[in-house]
Curated annotation (Swiss-Prot):
Its EC number is 3.6.5.3. This is Elongation factor Tu. The gene is tuf. CDD domains: EF_Tu, EFTU_II, EFTU_III. Residues 174-176 are annotated as: G5. It is found in: Cytoplasm. The keyword Hydrolase applies.
Length: 395
């Protein structure tokens, strides 16, 4: 049978399975593809195919991730599943697989476990905006009251981390039974996907977000002015737009884009993903530098102090061989530049070992354009020793 081409006309959403080891994340992933395959919306993938996830390297960090794709009547999904707990931690912090929503898998037979909590916390920290719950292995629990108890526990845990625990959809099912073709349990997979379709909103397209472009290079063209080059990260910029120059300097400056050039051709506008040169009115060559960003006025501010969730590379990944302590001063690489920063560790954490993940407070020596969810690397003498994501802004 010829493989059907995926319809690209449907809105695209990135999701993933999260939860404690052996609660059934990979089995559920296999079950979703198998059940949807019957409606022609996927290629059925077995447990073994998903579990044998290839290793990938993202910013020098080794991560095993399985990617599957499938579609429902209304949407096209890219779904990530990680074999090991460490892979989830790395994946979520580096944003190797950005998630618009997550399916939290909890075994009804065991209830929430330590990694259930940790994955919910990570989702909160790295900005996974929506979670749908799949209570798995319900075929093994005869007691209806016990199921309700586990559901309440999961809802409370989600609320504890500022997710709307009372409103989140919870579907009770059995991934294994669905995978084996039991119609009663297959219906639960269909129900789960209907909840995911309804509850997880279609993400805003990159081009609909406010304009932002990290400055990679600056040069002046005699008689015309100063050009900043870079790749548009999000949004759209048109000739005549007013933009702000943000970061590294005390004051945020504003200027008008008088020209947009791409591949030596003049354009009226550029959008997310385009590599451009932007001609800026009245900006001297020394008023703008690599590491700053051009952005829609008021859309992003420069900050020097924030909380971040960080994964510290292991020795095997080329990271440090020794732990670091509070007041450690590495470089923080944001978008196109390194800025020195000082680290404070949480109460009761003496040191951080290579291979750990930790929430830390960072104070940079110069402010940069950051928001919740901005990704960065931690570098020491030019080599990457950590990867992080801004969890919250302090000042």
């Amino acid at each position: 049978m010829a493989k059907e081409k995926f319809e690209r006309s449907k809105p695209h959403v990135n999701i993933g399975t999260i939860g404690h080891v052996d609660h059934g994340k990979t089995t559920l992933t296999a079950a979703i593809t198998t059940v949807l395959a019957k409606a022609g919306g996927a290629e059925a993938r077995g447990y073994d195919q998903i579990d044998a996830a290839p290793e990938e390297r993202e910013r020098g960090i080794t991560i095993s991730t399985a990617h599957v794709e499938y579609e429902t009547e209304t949407r096209h999904y890219a779904h990530v599943d990680c074999p090991g707990h460490a892979d989830y931690v790395k994946n979520m912090i580096t944003g190797a697989a950005q998630m618009d929503g997550g399916i939290l898998v909890v075994s009804a037979a065991d209830g929430p476990m330590p990694q259930t909590r940790e994955h919910i916390l990570l989702s909160r920290q790295v900005g996974v905006p929506y979670i749908v719950v799949f209570l798995n292995k319900c075929d093994m629990v005869d007691d209806e009251e016990l199921l309700e108890l586990v559901e309440m526990e999961v809802r409370d845990l989600l609320s504890e981390y500022e997710f709307p625990g009372d409103d989140i959809p919870v579907v009770k099912g059995s991934a294994l039974k669905a995978l084996e073709g039991d119609a009663e349990w297959e219906a639960k997979i269909v129900e789960l996907m209907a909840e995911v379709d309804a509850y997880i909103p279609t993400p805003e397209r990159e081009t609909d977000k406010p304009f932002l472009m990290p400055v990679e290079d600056v040069f002046s063209i005699t008689g015309r002015g100063t050009v900043a080059t870079g790749r548009v990260e999000r949004g759209v910029v048109k000739v005549g737009d007013v933009v702000e120059i943000i970061g590294l300097a005390e004051e945020t400056a504003s200027t008008t884009v008088t020209g947009v050039e791409m591949f030596r051709k003049l354009l009226d506008q550029a959008e997310a993903g385009d590599n451009i040169g932007a001609l800026l009115r009245g900006v001297a060559r020394e008023d703008i530098q690599r590491g700053q960003v051009l952005a829609k006025p008021g859309s992003v501010k420069a900050h020097a102090k924030f909380k971040a969730e960080v994964y510290v590379l292991s020795k095997e990944e080329g990271g440090r061989h020794t732990p670091f302590f509070a007041n450690y001063r590495p470089q923080f690489y944001f978008r196109t530049t390194d800025v020195t920063g000082i680290i404070q560790l949480p109460e009761g954490t003496e040191m951080v070992m290579p291979g750990d993940n930790v929430e830390m407070t960072v104070e940079l020596i110069a402010p940069v354009a950051v928001e919740e969810g901005t990704k960065f690397s931690i570098r020491e003498g030019g080599r990457t020793v950590g990867a992080g994501v801004v969890a919250s802004i302090i000042e």
